[in-house]
Amino acid sequence: MALMQDFKKFAMRGNVIDLAVGVIIGAAFGKIVDSLVNDLIMPLVARIVGKLDFSNLFIQLADAPAGVPQTLADLKKAGVPVFAYGNFITVAVNFLILAFIVFLMVRAITRVIDTNPPPADTPENTLLLRDIRDSLKSKNQ
């Protein structure tokens, strides 16, 4: 029974719950970024480049057996070595967009939550004491 109580204490700590919420929101955010990339950005890139699906971009490194279609999936299935760089391009674009969006979010949050409060106004009595001090210094010199 003590094991269950210890687990309950562990699971209900603020850090664990915050982490769980972060993972869930992160997974959902990843889907949003995937949609942003695949549905909005990649079609614009395709309009410029002329190709929408980068996952099938590859360089064939050896001759294929006779009768094998020249597609990435078929060449891999036939055991032909290929340099498949297209999927990497797509994943790299996803990462860069995700990193940029996270940067913008963190930047916005840090601006909203200003950790340095503005300096307090100097009290009137302190200003008066400074004037007296400065006056005494000037008389002594």
UniProtKB/Swiss-Prot annotation:
Pfam families: MscL (PF01741). It is found in: Cell inner membrane. One of its GO terms (molecular function) is mechanosensitive monoatomic ion channel activity. Disulfide bonds: none annotated. Keywords: Cell inner membrane, Cell membrane, Ion channel, Ion transport, Membrane, Transmembrane, Transmembrane helix, Transport. It is a multi-pass membrane protein. It comes from the Bacteria. The chain crosses the membrane at residues 16-36, 86-106. The keyword Calcium does not apply. Its main location: membrane. GO terms for cellular component: plasma membrane. InterPro entries: Mechanosensitive_channel_CS, MS_channel, MSC/AndL, MscL_channel. Belongs to the MscL family. Channel that opens in response to stretch forces in the membrane lipid bilayer. May participate in the regulation of osmotic pressure changes within the cell. HAMAP family: MscL. Homopentamer. This is Large-conductance mechanosensitive channel. The gene is mscL.
